[in-house]
UniProtKB/Swiss-Prot annotation:
NCBIfam families: clpX (TIGR00382), PRK05342.1 (NF003745). ATP binds at residues 120-127. It comes from Aeromonas hydrophila subsp. hydrophila (strain ATCC 7966 / DSM 30187 / BCRC 13018 / CCUG 14551 / JCM 1027 / KCTC 2358 / NCIMB 9240 / NCTC 8049). Keywords: ATP-binding, Chaperone, Metal-binding, Nucleotide-binding, Zinc. This is ATP-dependent Clp protease ATP-binding subunit ClpX. The lineage of its organism: Bacteria, Pseudomonadati, Pseudomonadota, Gammaproteobacteria, Aeromonadales. The gene is clpX.
Length: 424
């Protein structure tokens, strides 16, 4: 029986499952001639969650790409950086596996592994993060660390990062909590000096402190549909412990910090180790030896480094890698411009000597892969300006002389007479 008479006209209700009376529980929910208390509802939820957790990895395992598959996808879009790809593939796989199985596995709490990418300008840090988000079909947003300031100061609050992520998925909190956030220029928020100052460092150490809880995992309160916060407003609650944070930076000068640590203790005077200029380590070799203490010396606070346990270093791109970037990836620059010209019904051809010249120019500018587009854009500017007004052009050829500025691109016409007239 789920109800008993307490006295004349009084009914005492009991839970049909555990037998507790309505006075022993917080809430008793009525059904057709049955009752269930809040404690039994919670117990049922726990049982269902546990069963789903046991089934989920087996059911969803095939949907999550393996580290080998993630690496293969990155290879399609990013040239080189083999070590960084492997580190990212494992870290991303473990992160999403942790989300699918719950934060605990067999009673062991699984920690969060955010990622720090260290590499020179134009080495592919941003592209790697974008490609990962596209493969996993999760919301992705980028933030510039140089625009962030502590709360209460002019500039962007760190919680604006989560707001941008929510905007990417139409304010769907569940989707946002599975997203990826890439924070660029993270090296620019390093401490300005080792010495304490009477002036507040609101865009350096202050921002690192503000980012700590966000990166580690907290419940961020974000205004719905953007706008400023005010006391009467209801906020969206976003659990950042499920969001993967990838921080990247060029860390100019870090190689000198690493070198100082490496040579420390080698002796002085006659006992000192003498190194020739040719024996000096390259930027890539120096970055490969990076230790947490080097990042602390550079200006990142120990707590912040602790929240980024996975460190991947990217190498400088040489001329051969830049040539590969121009023609090999699925969305290679030459393929993009060829597709653009194809919309005009014109074939675009880059000769090998032209690709070599573009790569050499980018190397001279020290802009890495990022500088390739500006070079190609400048070379093709006049052609793209004139082409829509010209009739009968079937092909445009770019060679080394065009890149050097010694001649204009060669235009081949369908009609030989038009070709002859254009050559005059």
């Amino acid at each position: 029986m789920t109800e008993k008479r307490k006295g004349e006209g009084d009914k005492l209700l009991y839970c049909s499952f555990c037998g507790k009376s309505q006075h022993e529980v917080r809430k008793l929910i009525a059904g057709p001639s049955v009752y269930i208390c809040d404690e039994c509802v919670e117990l049922c939820n726990d049982i269902i969650r546990e069963e789903i957790r046991e089934i989920s990895p087996k059911r969803d395992g095939s949907e999550l790409p393996t580290p080998h598959e993630i690496r293969a996808h990155l290879d399609d879009y990013v040239i080189g950086q083999e070590y960084a790809k492997k580190v990212l593939a494992v870290a991303v796989y473990n992160h999403y596996k942790r989300l699918r199985s719950g934060s605990e596995s067999g009673g062991v709490e699984l920690g969060k592994s955010n990622i720090l990418l260290i590499g020179p300008t134009g080495s592919g840090k941003t592209l790697l993060a974008e490609t990962l988000a596209r493969l996993l079909d999760v919301p992705f947003t980028m933030a510039d660390a140089t625009t962030l300031t502590e709360a209460g100061y002019v500039g962007e609050d760190v919680e604006n990062i989560i707001q941008k992520l929510l905007q990417k998925c139409d304010y769907d909190v569940e989707k946002a909590q599975r997203g990826i956030v890439y924070i660029d220029e993270i090296d620019k928020i390093s401490r300005k000096s080792d010495n304490p100052s009477i002036t507040r460092d609101v865009s350096g150490e202050g921002v690192q402190q503000a980012l700590l809880k966000l990166i580690e995992g907290t419940i961020a309160s974000v205004p719905p549909q953007g706008g400023r916060k005010h006391p009467q407003q209801e906020f969206l609650q976003v659990d950042t412990s499920k969001i993967l944070f990838i921080c990247g930076g060029a860390f100019a000068g870090l190689d000198k910090v690493i070198e100082q640590r490496s040579v420390k203790g080698t002796g002085i005077g006659f006992g000192a180790e003498v190194k020739s200029k040719s024996a000096k380590a390259t930027l890539s070799e120096s970055f490969a030896k990076v230790e947490p203490e080097d990042l602390i010396k550079y200006g990142l606070i120990p707590e912040f480094i602790g929240r980024l346990p996975v460190v991947a270093t990217l190498t400088e791109l040489d001329e051969a890698a830049l040539i590969q970037i121009l023609k090999e990836p699925k969305n290679a620059l030459t393929k993009q411009y060829a597709a653009l010209f194809d919309l005009e019904g014109v074939e675009l051809e880059f000769r090998d000597d032209a690709l070599n010249a573009i790569a050499r120019k980018a190397m001279e500018r020290k802009t890495g892969a990022r500088g390739l587009r500006s070079i190609v854009e400048a070379v093709l500017l006049d052609t793209m300006y004139d082409l829509p007004s010209l009739d009968g052009v079937s092909k445009v050829v770019i060679d080394e002389t065009v890149i050097k500025g010694d001649s204009a691109p060669l235009m081949i016409y369908e009609n030989p007479e038009t070709q002859a007239a254009a050559s005059e």
